[in-house]
Amino acid sequence: MVKVYAPASSANMSVGFDVLGAAVTPVDGTLLGDNVTVEAAEQFSLQNLGRFASKLPTAPQENIVYQCWESFCREIGKTVPVAMTLEKNMPIGSGLGSSACSVVAALVAMNEFCGKPLNETRMLALMGEMEGRISGSIHYDNVAPCYLGGMQLMIEENGIISQQVPGFDEWLWVLAYPGIKVSTAEARAILPAQYRRQDCIAHGRHLAGFIHACYTRQPQLAAKLMKDVIAEPYRTKLLPGFSEARQAAMEMGAQACGISGSGPTLFALCDKPDTAQRVADWLGAHYLQNQEGFVHICRLDTAGARVVG
């Protein structure tokens, strides 16, 4: 029996649309992510458990974990009969890499169970492919940090899919999920087909400056450069109360604030625990819309997906 935990992730980070992502873990020890268990069996079966299991497709073939099993078996050239259990602790359509959690946990669990026949690069490529089935296009900005941990920059050249970018230990990520769903496909459809030259230049400057600031250990400069001219100006209309929440977070001392992934989760970056707590309390009172919403104060999850049983 193998049990794997895969952590939540925040893609884009305002400054790196489709090319940056960070794995996150709550400072209070709460597990924010999915678990997948694999056990030997005579034939394949899949059981869904966890807080958000009711949101999953009822037909096993439509479940991404089943599709991961099928693709993994095809990849290694043999059918491996197993009993799989998905603990779905992540809300779907939250902007926290929910589908990536399930994909990464399922594939890592299968790879561990079978004695690691696939290497890291092949695993990551397969993860991107599976993620693409849900979002409509292959992208790695959730699966790469979820699998490998830390902040990841998508390279996709010379056989390298992604590489780690050094983060800052003092950064606290306040993540507020309001409890509503935003589909990745819908959030992509709202974006323009073409961008103005000055927006392209600003985007390049922000992203290059951010990566430079990370490597030269300038946390305040890095945070200052976390600006989004590509997606946020268009996606805010899908997120009730986002503009007010961002303004409030910045006034309370957040270093940066933006949309996590395609939303509706908001992230606010703080460098002091008391600031993070103030921002978290405000968001809990004003940004959440129902009982399914939550706020977590997180740090970077540097471990990524891991065997927990």
Swiss-Prot record:
Checking NCBIfam families in the record gives: PRK01212.1-4, thrB
Q: Name one GO molecular function term.
A: ATP binding
* The protein's enzyme class: transferase
Q: List locations, semicolon-separated.
A: Cytoplasm
**Which taxonomic lineage does the organism of this UniProt entry have?**
Bacteria, Pseudomonadati, Pseudomonadota, Gammaproteobacteria, Enterobacterales
Q: What is this protein called?
A: Homoserine kinase
- Is Nucleotide-binding tagged as a keyword? yes
Query: What's this protein's family per the entry?
Result: Belongs to the GHMP kinase family. Homoserine kinase subfamily.
Q: Where does ATP bind?
A: 91-101
Q: In which pathway does it act?
A: Amino-acid biosynthesis; L-threonine biosynthesis; L-threonine from L-aspartate: step 4/5
Give the InterPro entries listed for this entry.
Answer: GHMP_kinase_C_dom (IPR013750), GHMP_kinase_C_sf (IPR036554), GHMP_kinase_N_dom (IPR006204), GHMP_knse_ATP-bd_CS (IPR006203), Homoserine_kinase (IPR000870), Ribosomal_Su5_D2-typ_SF (IPR020568), Ribsml_uS5_D2-typ_fold_subgr (IPR014721)
Q: What is its main location?
A: cytoplasm
Reaction it catalyzes: L-homoserine + ATP = O-phospho-L-homoserine + ADP + H(+)
Give the matching Pfam families.
GHMP_kinases_C, GHMP_kinases_N
Record's keyword terms, sorted: Amino-acid biosynthesis, ATP-binding, Cytoplasm, Kinase, Nucleotide-binding, Threonine biosynthesis, Transferase
Name the Gene3D superfamilies for this protein.
3.30.230.10, GHMP kinase, C-terminal domain
Any one of the GO BP annotations: threonine biosynthetic process
- Name the GO cellular-component terms: cytoplasm
Is Kinase set as a keyword in this record? Answer: yes
Role: Catalyzes the ATP-dependent phosphorylation of L-homoserine to L-homoserine phosphate.
Q: Which domain of life is it from?
A: Bacteria
Entry's EC annotation? 2.7.1.39
The encoding gene is thrB
